Amino acid sequence: SKEPVSVVLPDAEHPAFPGRTRRPGNARAGSQVTGSREVGQMPAPLSRKIGQKKQQLAQSEQQQTPKEKLSSTPGLLRSIYFSSPEDRPARLGPEYFDQPAVTLARAFLGQVLVRRLADGTELRGRIVETEAYLGPEDEAAHSRGGRQTPRNRGMFMKPGTLYVYLIYGMYFCLNVSSQGAGACVLLRALEPLEGLETMRQLRNSLRKSTVGRSLKDRELCNGPSKLCQALARSKSFDQRDLAQDEAVWLEHGPLESSSPAVVAAAAGIGHAGEWTQKPLRFYVQGSPWVSVVDRVAEQMYQPQQTACSDXALIVQK
């Protein structure tokens, strides 16, 4: 009879996580395989020891209360805000996005952005910072002067359309079109709720160096490009419908925020004249996940901001 042929299985790149590897079947990387089975068997003493350990764990789980089971689970395997998938709120429909940019930017605070990966994993983050762009009259907007190009087409599509663009040749930013031609809302920061370890892996895969300290939770999504990396967002999401897409959508936030919204000037805008100082950025006060904190704005608009209309805030210089 012929001798069995042993081969070494290479590691294949995982489609959902660039830089990570996916191993064929259940075989270990670099293990020898004959036909469809791994060579070698587990030593009997080790097998008995593992069996005893499994039995002990099973008995322990039977004695635990639901609360104890959740607290003893290593890592954040599911959102702390939902006890089951059935408890999750329905996605927001197209009518929700049909609002003026400023109104929509404020309404986004507290809502939950969801990203479903190719393997079914769902990542969730609560929106804590946004920025409104008002369209042709806005000198800081890509649509200033009514300019339409293939790049910014999403800004002129129906409300709820994603507008994704590249900056510095390597980072992406995620916007949502609103009511009004050329108007949109930039999503600037999220509070990670579910899938934190996956977010961390996605961020690490795109970092220049993964050697050194691990990213803290508050560093995962505290910036426009960071949240795109953490949720595996790329240019392929441009012009998708946030109300209909199967890989990305918005849900009602599970918790009402007790913190007021801070109204501040846009961040990171250089050459847009007076529009660099327009109070068109909104964030949840006290949130550690916000990208840029404006202490002056917090003192200026709290608590009297609730008595101001959005229009009054926009025209203020």
From Swiss-Prot:
KW Nucleus (keyword) present: yes
Signal peptide start and end residues: none
Location in the cell: Cytoplasm; Mitochondrion matrix, Mitochondrion nucleoid; Nucleus
Pfam family, one: Pur_DNA_glyco
Location of region: Disordered: 1-76
UniProt-listed Enzyme Commission number(s): 3.2.2.21
InterPro entries: Formyl_transferase-like_C_sf, MPG, MPG_sf
GO biological process: base-excision repair
Keywords: Cytoplasm, DNA damage, DNA repair, Hydrolase, Mitochondrion, Mitochondrion nucleoid, Nucleus, Phosphoprotein
Residues modified as Phosphoserine: S84, S258
Class of the enzyme per the UniProt entry, highest EC level: hydrolase
Regulation affecting activity: Binding to SSBP1 in mitochondria inhibits glycosylase activity in the context of a single-stranded DNA (ssDNA), but not a double-stranded DNA (dsDNA) substrates.
UniProt-recorded Gene Ontology molecular function terms: alkylbase DNA N-glycosylase activity; DNA binding
Highest taxon in the source lineage: Eukaryota
Biased composition regions of type Low complexity, renumbered to the chain: 53-64
Gene3D superfamilies in alphabetical order: Methylpurine-DNA glycosylase (MPG) (3.10.300.10)
Keyword presence, Iron-sulfur: no
GO terms under cellular component: mitochondrial nucleoid; nucleus
Subunit note: Binds MBD1. Binds SSBP1.
HAMAP family membership: 3MGH
Assigned protein family: Belongs to the DNA glycosylase MPG family.
Role of this protein: Hydrolysis of the deoxyribose N-glycosidic bond to excise 3-methyladenine, and 7-methylguanine from the damaged DNA polymer formed by alkylation lesions.
Protein name, entry field: DNA-3-methyladenine glycosylase
Annotated source species: Rattus norvegicus
